[in-house]
Amino acid sequence: MKIFGTDGVRGKAGVKLTPMFVMRLGIAAGLYFKKHSQTNKILIGKDTRKSGYMVENALVSALTSIGYNVIQIGPMPTPAIAFLTEDMRCDAGIMISASHNPFEDNGIKFFNSYGYKLKEEEEKAIEEIFHDEELLHSSYKVGESIGSAKRIDDVIGRYIVHLKHSFPKHLNLQSLRIVLDTANGAAYKVAPVVFSELGADVLVINDEPNGCNINEQCGALHPNQLSQEVKKYRADLGFAFDGDADRLVVVDNLGNIVHGDKLLGVLGVYQKSKNALSSQAIVATSMSNLALKEYLKSQDLELKHCAIGDKFVSECMRLNKANFGGEQSGHIIFSDYAKTGDGLVCALQVSALVLESKQASSVALNPFELYPQNLVNLNVQKKPPLESLKGYSALLKELDQLEIRHLIRYSGTENKLRILLEAKDEKLLESKMQELKEFFEGHLC
């Protein structure tokens, strides 16, 4: 049975993520990390979901039962776990979060001792241990060999210092008015402190988590409230994070939501202007708009494509010796400062770009026009191979003949089918999207 999806393990708390399942997974992961253990320490952080307590306690029980010492640091962004795992010299880091999913869901992400997400072969090795009954039941420690657990509440300071070091030393934010939407999630403590300490005039919204309101009509998936607040407050910029703050959505001074591909383009060129790029390559996923590739080419930069998921972006960056890349969805990686997408690092770089441009953000963050794109997330009841659907191949052939770029795939974390179409003719795009929706609704819903 496959346990891992495209971003760790994710499911409904109490249904897939039961205490028994989590304990078994924790033991399996712990035994895998034991093979290369240096410090016998594992770090655990979480977002603000109510079920995080249940999942955390199950993981602590599992890991200590096989002799690991566990450090619990409470609600922190996913990129903070990646950073602190290496910084605190732990064998591994674990983030308990379902990212942008509703509060009923939760998930578990693993990081190696260097702060990188696990490769697929590492996840498969953990899955093999998970299914090995004899190994699991023979691994419990007794007496003094049982591990310990301790909670540390002040590591947030380490991460704040790290974030501030990513911001250019010759700049400050005193001239900027910024609205932050922390999605009632993991960034609710750290984001306001970072921007305030760098001098910004800050307004914070959705920073009162109650365990059930994470991502609820707020944050990166629902930036309309942020847009309204930016206009009302006459702010220069607005930043919306998702539940675990590895994703960023930017709103300009006019209240417009800045497209993720425009962000990638303008930030890439900004990094080039500072001689901060390690190569001429910038990495993005197959969902990126063709206009991004054309814009980067005009700036003597090359776009490299990879599979969808920030861990694939990170891997492609390493293969191409690139230090900048990301996803249209707002997972943007500055690998000089973060091993994974970091919404706060990205927000600080956007702020620096706007400051140095000496332009309004609505101008500075709008470097090129996009080709019309249409993305639909369709709720599905089943996930058969798309190639097995009668008429599917003919649909794709027709799209190719009409020169409509297409990307159709199941979500790796939700019961959804993602349909992306791109073409120069917007009316044709809308017509074909409606046809596709009706086709898949008839087969999958």
Curated annotation (Swiss-Prot):
The active site is at residue 99. Keywords: Isomerase, Magnesium, Metal-binding, Phosphoprotein. Disulfide bonds: none annotated. Its EC number is 5.4.2.10. One of its GO terms (molecular function) is phosphoglucosamine mutase activity. PROSITE patterns: PGM_PMM. It is an enzyme of class 5 (isomerase). The keyword Transmembrane helix does not apply. The gene is glmM. This is Phosphoglucosamine mutase. The modification Phosphoserine is found at residue 99. Mg(2+) binds at residues 99, 242, 244, 246. Belongs to the phosphohexose mutase family. Binds 1 Mg(2+) ion per subunit. It catalyses: alpha-D-glucosamine 1-phosphate = D-glucosamine 6-phosphate.
